Amino acid sequence: MKNLVGLDSEKAEALVVELNILLADYEIFYQNLRGLHWNIKGRKFFELHDKFEELYKDAFEKIDEIAERILTLEGEPLHTYTDYLATTQIKEEKNVSDGTKGVEVVVNNFRTLVEKERHILTIAADTNDEGTVSLMSDYITETEKTLWMLNSYLK
């Protein structure tokens, strides 16, 4: 049986499960970034405050895109923090004020995200879901570049 965009319904349902995990990951990542943005201190305050804001704004957009992709595949996006916390593979961070530690948190979160994005890309390709393939491909390209930049910052 096919869904409204012509994909195998069972395969699309399996993809929705993975996209919901990514959605939960991005929600917790977003909140981690907000906390870093608010709580960062020290000599690198201005540059990191701005960078964390840039990153949380980008994460916010991705959250909406992922939720809408889930809906396009006839799934239901997770939408409560209870569900996010039960589903996420990203650890909540609390009261991080050190710049280096904050960047390390972001790097670790991005590593988790890119691993999940690659996994979803593979499943989407096997499902012939070009919409999700395109979305994940764009995310992976962005995430890899950001990881390179943040790792360079830490050296």
Give a label for each model feature.
Residues 1-22, 99-102:
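Disorder-to-helix initiation segments
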Residues 7-14, 28-54, 119-131:
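Helix-loop segments that flank and shape redox-cofactor active sites
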Residues 23, 30, 37, 56, ...:
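A structural signal for well-ordered alpha-helices, especially hydrophobic packing surfaces
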Residues 39, 76-98:
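Short, helix-capping/interhelical loops that line the mouth of catalytic, cofactor-
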Residues 44-83:
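Conserved alpha-helical segments that form or flank metal/cofactor-binding pockets of metalloenzymes
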Residues 45, 77, 81-85, 107-115, ...:
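Long, contiguous binding/interaction regions
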Residues 46, 53-64, 123-140, 144-149:
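Charged, amphipathic alpha-helical segments and their flanking helix caps
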Residues 64, 68, 88-136:
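Acidic/histidine-rich alpha-helical segments that form the ligand environment
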